Each structure stands twice: as structure tokens, then as C-alpha cells.
Amino acid sequence: MTVETDKQTLGFQTEVKQLLQLMIHSLYSNKEIFLRELVSNAADAADKLRFEALVKPELLEGSGELRIRVDYDKDARTVTIDDNGIGMSREDAVSHLGTIAKSGTADFLKHLSGDQKKDANLIGQFGVGFYSAFIVADQVDVYSRRAGLPASEGVHWSSRGEGEFEIASVDKPERGTRIVLHLKEGEESFADGWTLRGILKKYSDHIGLPIEMRKEHYGEAADKPAEPEWEAVNRASALWTRPKSEIKDEEYQEFYKHVAHDAGNPLAWSHNKVEGKLEYTSLLFVPGRAPFDLYHRDSAKGLKLYVQRVFIMDQAEQFLPLYLRFIKGVVDSSDLSLNVSREILQSGPVVDSMKSALTKRSLDMLEKLAKDKPDDYATFWRNFGQALKEGPAEDYANREKIAGLLRFSSTHDTTGAQSVGLADYVGRLADGQDKLYYLTGESYAQIKDSPHLEVFRKKGIEVLLLTDRIDEWLMSYLTEFDGKSFVDVARGDLDLGKLDSEEDKKAQEEVAKSKEGLASRIKAALGDDVAELRVSHRLTDSPAILAIGQGDLGLQMRQLLEASGQAVPESKPVFEFNPTHPLIEKLDAEQDMDRFGDLSRVLFDQAALAAGDSLKDPAAYVRRLNKLLLELSA
């Protein structure tokens, strides 16, 4: 029996206690996933040993043959997962098995929805896969020794998943980690060779090192060898090194789940081998849903980097631009050195060339998804659309390609769904239309009936409706598409070009001239709150509207700056009025200057509200409105 020393009983971190209760009582509907998670962790431990052994070959301790072994004991009701990877020290065991970084568990708990299937999918993504052992086990024992430490510095960690764990020092001659699961009553079916082989084949066939189980011997006991014979139950070859023609969709899907720590299937993938001046293989995936921290600055992003099939690092961010941070996968290069570091990856012709090619490959994959599977692309857009909208600012070379992948709401579709591509929009341009019109706002509901759209509805011209907070910033970089300029319909003096006939333009000029006196009176009433007064060519039904000055920030950008605590440049709107509206005609006829001032102010405030802005002095607006209502009801 192994002698234990320095035994301690320690409590789990609070969040881990909550997590264990969820695991044990409610979370997994698909219990067999525990084996996938533990085998995946064992494979990561082997990768880490390979990487550290590049600099310190003595860590291999004379045995470089890495493997994972899965065993079971029907009588004892146990399942054992054993690896000879990097292993853990006592401090590692307390740190990794007794606590989880706050960004992991706390956020995991916050994102639980109560839907077992959805919640189970979160496990690997949040790095809490080890605790899935408690779904089928009422006790878990972990024996481990970190490579490079003496045999006497092994560690035994044990817990029943009830809020605390024991840890002790033990002798462990072999490096690596052995996890023994003591199965609960009713979970004995997992202590079976065929069951375990089936699960491993299903979830772990792609793992790049052998997963071994004892050979099954049927017949007389005398025929069984004295020492157990082990055989690999998986292919044990890196999936990306195999020819595409030999790989089934299901294998790609399971590999994705391993590299992305995601239990759902990817929407698309692209597997390519590049030969010639540069040699590398890439396998890229588009996930089916966004991680919880997609927009966190320190979120996990980047590809797994291998050099000549040796794992080098997770989250190599240098091979894809930030706006494609959701792409998962691996890149295996023959042109980088085995001792490559993150610093070396920061720049250089090899990395730059690979980044350019992988970016194009990713965008091609999205184009194909949009063309061949529009429903799946709609799912992609709901999850990652706002990240892709960062592209035109970050990647000038691919701006037009990215623009073609963007989706917006528009006046063409009354559902408000972001389903309109720019190519679709260009294909529906009205005769004589040489500009692409858009309007930004907080929500589809807020801008779908905006007064700014009135003239476009009258003429049957489609307008894009941009409602994401990033959109106004996006349009400052995306100035044209397919050779046609974008025009914000709420900005400047609207010129419809050929969409207005010469007769229309002449009539507009005459009306504007005839209303110069009224414009001067309204300007005097509104004072410095407006930059300019003019007759509107935008309005057909509303009395007035506020337009944004040509060089001024729009409402979205002002709100973004305010929210981030930055100074907002001062700007004043342009007040446009509809000379044919009955309210404006009554205003023109009003001789009482106080009443004229009140009416002008109410129209100004209503125009601000219609534009989605807030009032500087809502109490004054209500007071004036009440005064006018009293006069009307007298």
C-alpha cells in the first residue's frame, strides 16, 4: 500500500462547490461525455510535456512514448484514465483541482440557462471538464507526479465532490496522472470494455496519441497472459495530416469539439495543405455559437500552433486578424522553428504570409457558407456579425470581401431581421440610383418609421437600417461598395441626384426661397440650439426633422463616447421643416411671438425624439405641450 505523508483536508473554492452540485444533480443528460473531457485533458498534458521537453529533454525521463490508457474493474466498480504527460505537483493539484480562475467558473455559472443540453455544451468551453467525473462517480482519486520531480514528490488528491478534498504526498515512480473514478450505484455500465471502447471511438478517435485499453481475452483463464496486453483503440494520428478524402464529416466535427472545447458541431470547416515556397497545413472551423467572452479583451482567441506535428502553443493570435477571433482550429507549419516563441511570432515574412493566406481562407469559407447554406450563415451572423463588422477598419486589403459578408436590416423587409447583403441591395437599386442609402439608430423599432425615410418610401427607394452600436463607426471606414458611395440619409443636405427630376429640383428651390422669412423666424426662436434652418426635401408626412451636420458625429457615436467617458465634440443639429405640412402652415400664420416660440420649441423637441435623441429639458417640453393642449381644449 502506498504510504501517504503531509495529508491535508482543504475546502473547494465557493464557485467549485456550486459547480459540483450542478454536475452531480442536474447538468449532464449525456453522461458519457465525462470520458471525452478526461481524455482531452490527458491529451493536453501530453502536448504540454512535448513542448517543455523541447528545451528540457530530461523531462521525458528516458521515455518519450506518450500514451493514454483507459482501464476498468467491474468488481471494484472503477474506471481509470492514466497518462504519462506533464503531470502535476502538489501545488498544481491544489490550484488546478481545488480552484478555478474566476473568469472560468463564475462566468460559467452566470451563463447557465437551465436547459441541460445547452448547459452541458458549456463545460469544456469554460475549462471545467475535470469536474464532469462527478456525474458518474461518487469518489474521484487522482495520483500524479510532475515530470522532473523526484518519485517521492507524487501527489494523491481525493474528493467525494461534497465541498472539500484531501491531498497527500505519495511515492509515484512514473510521471503523469492517473484518475480513478469510483462509479456511483447505477453507473456500473461504464465499467465495461465494449462501452468504453465505443465512447472513445465516438469522441476521441482524432486524438493524436494512442489511447490504449487492455486486450479482451475470451476463453479459459489459462490462455490469458500474466501481464496485461495493451492495444490502441483510436487512430492515433493527427487528423489534419490525413488526406481530406479519407476523413468523414463526423470526424471533423469531433475534432472541432476537442480543439474548441465545444460540445456543438461547427457550421463549416476548411482543411488545406499548402506546398511550395511555404509549407503548412491548416484546419479552420466556424463555430456554431459565440463564446461568452467573445468581446472581452483578454478572451481566448487564436489557433493551436504545431511545428512539424509538435504542439507549440494554444491561442496563437498572430495568424488571424482580431475580427476573425472566433475562428477555431490548428495550423501546422514546416517553416517555423521548434523553439518559436510568441515574441518571434509577432512579425516576420513567414508569419505575415501565413496570416494573409489564412485570413483569405477564412473569408472564402464564410462566403461559401453564405452561398450554400444561408440558414447556417444566418446563425453565424447572429453570433459573430458584430465581430465581423470590425473588419473594414482593421483589414483594408479585404474590405470589399468583408463588406460582401455583412448583413443588415432594410426597408425591403418588414421583419427587422439582419438578412440583407450589400450585393442583394445593389441588385435592387432603383433606376437612376447611384448611391447606397442607410440610416443608423438604436433599434429597428426606433428607426423603421423615422421621418428621414419618408421621401424614400414615396419614391420606392430601399434604405439600409443599421441598428448595432458599432454601425456608425463601421460606416466611417466602409465608404463605398461595388463602386457606389454610401450616404447617411440623416446627414447633411440630402441630394437624391438623378432620383429627383429637374422639375422637382426647381420647385424645391422656389419653395425654399418663399419660406426664407419663416426660416428666419424659427431660427430666432430656437437661437443657438440649431446650426441652421432650411426647408426639407426629406419629409412628406412629418412637420419637422433634425439632420446631422455633414462633419458632425451621429447619435450612436456620441452615445458610445459618452458611455466610455470620453469627451464628445460639441455639435448642433440642422432643423428642417416641411413647408406643406398643416402645422408648419399654422406656424407661419402665427403672429403672437410667444406662442410662435412655444410652437417652434415643441416642434424642435418632437423632431429630437423622432431622431432617437433625448431632450435636454424634458420638463420645459411638457410644460409647453400642456399649455398648448389647454389652449386647444378651451
UniProtKB/Swiss-Prot annotation:
A single Gene Ontology CC term: cytoplasm
Quaternary data: Homodimer.
Span list, region B: 343-559
Entry's Gene Ontology molecular function annotations: ATP binding; ATP hydrolysis activity; ATP-dependent protein folding chaperone; unfolded protein binding
SUPFAM superfamilies: ATPase domain of HSP90 chaperone/DNA topoisomerase II/histidine kinase (SSF55874), HSP90 C-terminal domain (SSF110942), Ribosomal protein S5 domain 2-like (SSF54211)
Coiled coil (UniProt feature): none
Subcellular location(s) per record: Cytoplasm
Role according to the record: Molecular chaperone. Has ATPase activity.
One Pfam family linked to the record: HSP90
Organism for this UniProt entry: Xanthomonas axonopodis pv. citri (strain 306)
HAMAP family: HSP90
Keywords: ATP-binding, Chaperone, Cytoplasm, Nucleotide-binding, Stress response
Keyword Chaperone: yes
Family per record: Belongs to the heat shock protein 90 family.
Domain of life: Bacteria
Lineage: Bacteria, Pseudomonadati, Pseudomonadota, Gammaproteobacteria, Lysobacterales
Protein's recorded name: Chaperone protein HtpG
Gene assigned in the entry: htpG
